[in-house]
């Protein structure tokens, strides 16, 4: 029995593609119409569901046609088709099911597993919606990966040992994304992203349509901008013209019987040159400049530090786009893989790795939720942020909360809330043997480490005694997707309230710390500080203690500012007194 394949799917806004590993290399699977790309269009007709080119051809005549559903993924919006509401996940599932079915027909075996790509900017809700669409389609989604990572995987098959910085310029049908990746030793890491989710090939088509409408109106004084049938024909011709102008300097556009006037049917014909096309779409090409600059800035890279530029998306075939990329980055972009297919091929590579068909590529994963510990006042202090690429290691120094504290309790937390109690506790342990010392003096080094399998190790070490305690947690990833999503959503909904709580606790901790410092300083200062200043400081300390006790944080903040002024004055007085004593001692020694 043949080993089960894991297919790679580029679920695009305009078109979708499916690929699989054969003989260690990714190949594209053609759909039943013999096409390597499938329009991401779904039509409902008399309860029949039609996907792809056949659905696209009904866009004008059939009101129950859905296009560009990807832009709605992760939202609560619904699409009403033939009197019934459908979620974006359900519509996307029809596209995925269609691709799953024809992949099975091509491969001659059952397909139940897939890797699906998403834009790098997709949030958790959008990623989860994509995975849910796969589940509805009968697919076990093994991994959701970023489109630029997939593109780099496809290009990186033959250069796994090189360390490079790669810029992926992805201009698709409906969105534009630019990503910068660090590649080396078979690992791929996205270090910066930018883009415009309302810019793509469709916008170029619209400019040609506007140009054609203007030509027709000028010649025949007819406005076709509200005529659906005519607009669909114009859209089809505009798309063809755009594609042909990538390889030709001019194209003929023929629209027989496009309209009627008092003289009868009107047939329209014109020529669109590449020069004119560049002129009417220049503003669209220019809109890609700033995202490229933003990505370079975020990655802290200059164009000269980019080793390679990859073009992704059918719209990168436009010569003006290629010229812009070349001038922006001072290098010829790599166009060796079909830009419409490269993302699906990369997804197939990742599927091949998971299926054991491709080796020597490190799969990077990320932490779904932040990890940290409970600190004074019940605050969650994060050491590893959500979406950190693993393996990862972070270390931070903490201290004791009370004088002569003999031990510290480490409560390991997972979640996004500001308060420890609102997050999930993964485990607890105690570090003992801390030598007696005033609060804040002992140095406790806490280290979080996550290996490639997602196993978390947390250690606490007393830097004075080298006493160390470690806990290993293997269930940090055992939350269901629903739980992860719920925790993220709760954090977003409670962000303002949580931040206010955290701020108040930090203010309280700061107040108690200052009180401790002042009381210790007053004790040590003895007669070096005036009785009046002692009385003033003690009065303020008592007032602050009362405010802390009553949780009057607004007044506490004001008093803290006064306390800091008093501390500064006390320090200045003590320094002057010390200088005076020093001078007196010096004079006595000289006599």
From Swiss-Prot:
The induction annotation reads: By stress conditions e.g. heat shock.
Q: Which residues carry this modification: Phosphothreonine?
A: 175
**InterPro entries from the UniProt entry:** ATPase_NBD, Chaperone_DnaK, Heat_shock_70_CS, HSP70_peptide-bd_sf, Hsp_70_fam
Q: Which UniProt keywords apply?
A: ATP-binding, Chaperone, Nucleotide-binding, Phosphoprotein, Stress response
Task: Tell me which positions the record assigns to the signal sequence.
Answer: none
Which stretches does UniProt call biased (Low complexity)?
581-591
Q: Does the keyword ATP-binding apply?
A: yes
Region Disordered, annotated ranges = 570-591
A Pfam family it matches: HSP70
Q: Establish whether keyword Chaperone is in the entry.
A: yes
Show the GO MF annotations.
ATP binding; ATP-dependent protein folding chaperone; unfolded protein binding
Free-text function comment from the UniProt entry: Acts as a chaperone.
What the record says about family reads: Belongs to the heat shock protein 70 family.
In terms of PANTHER family, this protein maps to:
HEAT SHOCK PROTEIN 70KDA
User: Which NCBIfam families does the entry mention?
Assistant: PRK00290.1, prok_dnaK
Record protein name field: Chaperone protein DnaK
What is the protein's species of origin?
A: Mycoplasma capricolum subsp. capricolum (strain California kid / ATCC 27343 / NCTC 10154)
Taxonomic lineage: Bacteria, Bacillati, Mycoplasmatota, Mollicutes, Mycoplasmataceae
């Amino acid at each position: 029995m043949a080993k089960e394949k894991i297919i790679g799917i580029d679920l695009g806004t305009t078109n979708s593609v499916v690929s699989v590993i054969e003989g260690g290399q990714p190949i594209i699977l053609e759909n039943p119409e013999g096409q390597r790309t499938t329009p991401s269009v779904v039509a409902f007709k008399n309860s029949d569901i039609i996907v792809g080119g056949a659905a696209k051809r009904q866009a004008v005549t059939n009101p129950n046609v859905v296009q560009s559903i990807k832009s709605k993924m992760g939202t609560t919006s619904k699409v009403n088709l033939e009197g019934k509401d459908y979620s974006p996940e359900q519509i996307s599932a029809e596209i995925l099911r269609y691709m799953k079915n024809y992949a099975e027909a091509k491969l001659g075996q059952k397909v139940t597993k897939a890797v699906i790509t998403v834009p790098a900017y997709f949030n958790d809700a959008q990623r989860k919606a994509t995975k849910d669409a796969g589940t509805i389609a009968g697919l076990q989604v093994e991994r959701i990966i970023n489109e630029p990572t997939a593109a780099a995987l496809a290009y990186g098959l033959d250069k796994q040992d090189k360390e490079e910085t790669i810029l992926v310029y992805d201009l698709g049908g409906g969105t534009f994304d630019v990503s910068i990746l660090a590649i080396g030793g078979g690992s791929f890491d996205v270090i910066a992203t930018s883009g415009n989710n309302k810019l793509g090939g469709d916008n170029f088509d619209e400019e040609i349509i506007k140009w054609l409408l203007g030509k027709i109106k000028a010649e025949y004084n007819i406005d076709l901008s509200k005529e659906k049938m005519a607009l669909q024909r114009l859209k089809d011709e505009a798309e063809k013209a755009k594609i042909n102008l990538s390889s030709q300097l001019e194209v003929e556009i023929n629209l027989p019987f496009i309209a009627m006037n008092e003289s009868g049917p009107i047939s329209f014909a014109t020529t669109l040159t590449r020069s004119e096309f560049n002129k009417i779409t220049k503003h669209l090409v220019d809109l890609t400049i700033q995202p490229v600059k933003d990505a370079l800035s975020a990655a802290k890279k200059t164009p000269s530090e980019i080793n390679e530029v990859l073009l992704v998306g059918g719209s990168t075939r436009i010569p003006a786009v290629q010229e812009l990329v070349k001038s922006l980055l001072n290098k010829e972009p790599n166009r060796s893989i079909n830009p419409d297919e490269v993302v699906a091929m990369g997804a197939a590579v990742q599927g091949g790795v998971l299926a054991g068909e491709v080796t020597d590529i490190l799969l990077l994963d990320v932490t779904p939720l932040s990890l940290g510990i409970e600190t004074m006042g019940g605050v969650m202090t994060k050491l590893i942020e959500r979406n950190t690429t693993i393996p990862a290691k972070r270390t931070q120094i903490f201290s004791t909360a009370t004088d002569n504290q003999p031990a510290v309790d480490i409560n390991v937390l997972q979640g996004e809330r500001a308060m420890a109690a609102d997050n999930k506790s993964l485990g607890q342990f105690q570090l003992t043997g801390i030598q007696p010392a005033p609060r804040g003096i002992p140095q406790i080094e806490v280290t979080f480490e996550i290996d490639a399998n997602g196993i978390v190790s947390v250690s606490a070490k007393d830097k004075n005694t080298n006493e160390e305690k470690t806990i290993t947690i293997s269930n940090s990833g055992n939350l269901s997707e629903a739980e992860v999503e719920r925790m993220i959503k709760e954090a977003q909904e409670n962000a303002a309230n949580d931040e206010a709580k955290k701020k108040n606790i930090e203010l309280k901790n700061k107040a108690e710390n200052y009180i401790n410092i002042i009381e210790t300083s007053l004790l040590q200062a003895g007669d070096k500080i005036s009785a009046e200043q002692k009385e003033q400081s003690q009065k303020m300390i008592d007032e602050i203690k009362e405010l802390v006790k009553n949780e009057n944080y607004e007044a506490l903040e004001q008093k803290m500012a006064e306390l800091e002024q008093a501390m500064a004055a006390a320090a200045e007085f003590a320094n002057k007194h010390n200088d005076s004593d020093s001078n007196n001692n010096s004079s006595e020694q000289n006599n």
